[in-house]
């Protein structure tokens, strides 16, 4: 990401994504966001003060630096002595466009500043010396006083972060991941997380601080609101962190309790409404789209690419000459799911598109197969030619098997709902049915993860593959976001500063192999959706090819893969072209780039030793 202002072309996020899969089955944004029926409304924290253990309220100010001779403390405005080449102080003279103490390579060059950038910077390119096209801009090493305890969970040399992980024996998570034979354990995840932190702290400027990480194992399953709320209370009362990463992804209770206690988090629950985030500024950030944003993209795709035309990609030949009749299958995860479905149908109506049959289901292993039979029968009776699916990555297996059993062969329209658009899960669906699947994806076209990915960078840096070999693609985005923003916050680390740095950054560049992210007010979405607390803004067009063989996202070899149209070309809201989809056209389509596209090539470097 690049900051707005004089340095608007300077700052880039680091390698956030090899595979963007929001957060472990983050699930089922299925989930489409919103409150749990039994969740209490959290108390909105209006004050910027911080509660400390003794109950005394303290202002979130920069701590005064104690004087070395034991006398009066020095003012925070007094910068420590430095030598040339200049180590960063907080005062750079002219307006830099950055927060105090922050400087990036291109802006320093514009100002004529001489800075020893160190080995972590490729000074020929002005980017970090890591083998990735998405390497972030070099941040100047900081040599000044960082303010010490600038906010809750922050000291002169540490930032307390709690990372929530599910239990190894969580039956809901086991059900979700068993289909793709994911055998990573919580211990594997923790080892990989700590390895990623070493990597980021070696290359990113942290202003004298390191993350003091606590791994917290959930006390219940990812669907249990009572356990989730208890976990949030424990986070507050026992760990008192600056921020939390992760959370039980099928309930909002964890996030709501954290926010009521003034603790921000990244990917700590299902997506919420824009109103929720506006009422709790700086408290929550997600990496994927919001449910309402995704609805807008899907409606535009259907309205521009599919509506009014014959269902030429249906498996039933008799449907191919008929004008498309749309049905929708969606996951009922909370009361907000109902609102989201209604919003989607209203958006489609703006394109004069009607959903002739809309059916919801509940993700329950005991009832899913029975529900699938009933729902498919309804679709067939309504003469639906094109089924719009918005749900979890397990259910399409049951729906497609049931459709085959009932000799019903429609088009399947995928909508970017989490993990449905991964090859790993799509191989578990009825392949003849799924050979008629196409639509949009939030994911980007993949590059062979042996040559360009979070997996590749981990092995490059550590000299060995990550223990969480399956999960690293969904672990890495959160610390990637955290450290990229941390560089822009500067030495005076506060929750408000974190939000300011993130919101002042320009969108990340779009590429064939990475989505574009933005936060704040960037005019990428209607006013009702901004400020934007979600990350990914664009989509790609995809279709399922049951014939091609290759590796899935977790290196399982097999048959059947998603094809990305035009090499993975991406579109923002309003940019989706009119006209028939390019589904099932081999020309220009790609399953996996065996090497980065020529436009995304990068130099090779030797890794630095861990800091």
Regions found by a protein language model. Name each.
Residues 2-21:
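N-terminal export and membrane-targeting signals
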Residues 25-47:
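C-terminal region of N-terminal signal peptides and the immediate post-cleavage residues
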Residues 42-85:
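Extracellular mucin-like PTS domains
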Residues 81-231:
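N-terminal extracellular/periplasmic Venus flytrap/periplasmic-binding protein-like
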Residues 84-148, 152, 507-611:
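Solvent-exposed, acidic/polar segments of extracytosolic/periplasmic ligand-binding ectodomains
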Residues 91, 112, 116, 122-124, ...:
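Extracytoplasmic ligand/sensor domains, especially the bilobed periplasmic-binding protein
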Residues 147, 188-194, 202-280, 361-369, ...:
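Beta-alpha junction/loop-to-helix N-cap segments that form part of ligand/metal-binding clefts
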Residues 392-398, 443-508:
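Extracellular/periplasmic ligand-binding modules, especially the Venus flytrap/periplasmic-binding
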């Amino acid at each position: 990401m690049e900051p707005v202002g004089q340095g608007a072309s300077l700052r880039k996020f680091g390698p956030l994504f090899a595979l963007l899969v929001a957060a472990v089955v983050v699930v089922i944004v299925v989930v489409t966001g919103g409150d749990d029926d039994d969740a209490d409304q959290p108390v909105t924290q209006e004050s910027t003060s911080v509660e400390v253990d003794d109950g005394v309220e303290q202002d979130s100010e920069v701590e005064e630096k104690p004087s070395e001779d034991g006398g009066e403390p020095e003012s925070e405005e007094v910068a420590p002595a430095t030598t040339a080449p200049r180590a960063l102080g907080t005062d750079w003279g002219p307006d830099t466009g950055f927060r105090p103490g922050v400087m990036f390579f291109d802006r320093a060059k514009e100002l004529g500043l001489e800075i020893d950038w160190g080995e972590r910077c490729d000074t020929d390119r002005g980017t970090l010396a890591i083998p990735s096209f998405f390497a972030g801009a070099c941040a100047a090493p900081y040599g000044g006083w960082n303010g010490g305890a600038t906010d809750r969970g922050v000291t002169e040399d540490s930032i307390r972060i709690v990372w929530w992980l599910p239990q190894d024996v969580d039956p809901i998570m086991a059900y979700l991941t068993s289909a793709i034979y994911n055998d990573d354990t919580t211990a594997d995840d923790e080892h990989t997380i700590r390895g990623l932190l070493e990597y980021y702290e070696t290359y990113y400027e942290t202003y004298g601080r390191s993350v003091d990480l606590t791994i917290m194992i959930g006390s219940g399953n990812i669907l249990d609101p009572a356990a989730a709320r208890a976990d949030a209370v424990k986070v507050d009362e026992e760990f008192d962190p600056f921020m939390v990463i992760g959370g039980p992804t099928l309930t909002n209770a964890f996030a709501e309790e954290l926010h009521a206690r003034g603790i921000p988090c990244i990917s700590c629950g299902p997506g919420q409404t824009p109103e929720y985030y506006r009422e709790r500024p700086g408290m929550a950030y997600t990496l994927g789209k919001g449910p309402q944003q995704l609805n807008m993209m899907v409606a535009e795709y259907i309205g521009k690419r599919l509506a009014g035309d014959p269902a030429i990609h249906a498996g039933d030949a008799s449907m191919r000459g008929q004008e498309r009749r749309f049905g929708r299958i969606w996951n009922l995860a909370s009361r907000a799911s109902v609102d989201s479905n209604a919003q989607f149908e209203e958006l489609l109506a703006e394109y004069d598109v009607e959903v002739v049959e809309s059916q919801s289901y509940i993700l329950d292993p005991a009832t899913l197969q029975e529900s699938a039979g009933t729902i498919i029968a309804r679709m067939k009776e309504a003469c639906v030619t094109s089924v719009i699916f918005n749900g979890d990555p397990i259910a399409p297996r049951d729906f497609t098997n049931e459709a085959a059993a009932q000799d019903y062969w429609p088009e399947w329209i995928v909508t970017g709902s989490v993990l449905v658009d991964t090859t790993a899960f799509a191989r578990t669906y009825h392949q003849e049915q799924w050979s008629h699947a196409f639509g949009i994806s939030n994911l980007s076209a993949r590059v062979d993860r042996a040559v360009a990915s979070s997996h590749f960078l981990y092995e490059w840096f550590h000299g060995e593959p990550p223990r969480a070999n399956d999960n690293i693609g969904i672990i890495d985005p959160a610390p990637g976001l955290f450290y990229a923003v941390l560089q822009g916050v500067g030495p005076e680390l506060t929750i408000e500063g974190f939000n300011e740095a993130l919101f002042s950054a320009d969108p990340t560049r779009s590429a064939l192999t990475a989505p574009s992210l933005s936060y704040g007010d960037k005019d990428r979405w209607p006013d009702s959706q901004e400020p934007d607390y979600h990350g990914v803004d664009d989509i790609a067009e995809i279709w399922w090819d049951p014939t091609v063989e290759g590796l899935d996202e977790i290196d399982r070899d097999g048959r059947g893969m998603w094809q990305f149209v035009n090499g993975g070309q991406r579109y923002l809201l309003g940019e989706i072209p009119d006209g028939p989809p390019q589904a099932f056209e081999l020309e220009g389509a790609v399953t996996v780039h065996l090497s980065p596209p020529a436009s995304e090539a990068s130099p090779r470097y030797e890794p630095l030793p861990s800091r």
